[in-house]
Amino acid sequence: RRQRQMCIRDRSKALAEAKTAFEKDEVPVGAVIVSNDKIIARAHNLTEMLNDVTAHAEMQAITSAANYLGGKYLNDCTLYVTLEPCQMCAGAMYWAQLSRLVFGATDPHRGYRKLNTTLHPKTKVSYGVLSNECKLLIDAFFIKKRKLKKT
């Protein structure tokens, strides 16, 4: 029961990060990395603010977690992210040897599974967590962008 409560907390924190990104006119993706039931990194997309195509929530969180742990491997960590990671982020997860990935909404256009990108063999994956909330936030962002483009 405690484990389930921790998972709900971590998923909710990732969604809160995505909402922060939305408020900053960033693609609303949020990420949280957990080690030993403790959140060690939180991040959201910063690609617009930093003018950096690699500043995805997952990349920011991986860097922050590695700095916190004092090493590049995250083999005892879980990454909670609101959207299926892209190929670039999946590659970073592979090299970090992430033990578990949990994502909310799937990304049929740019998600890592579309191009059959593989994660580290030890990485366990689950998805569909808060998927509705995650998808609604992404959809709202792009609807807003399209409306602004028309005016």
Residue locations for each model-derived region?
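Short, small-residue-biased leader/transition segments that mark boundaries at the very start
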Residues: 1-8
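Short, structured loop/turn "capping" segments at alpha-beta junctions
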Residues: 25, 72-75, 148-149
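Short, basic/aromatic recognition patches
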Residues: 9-24
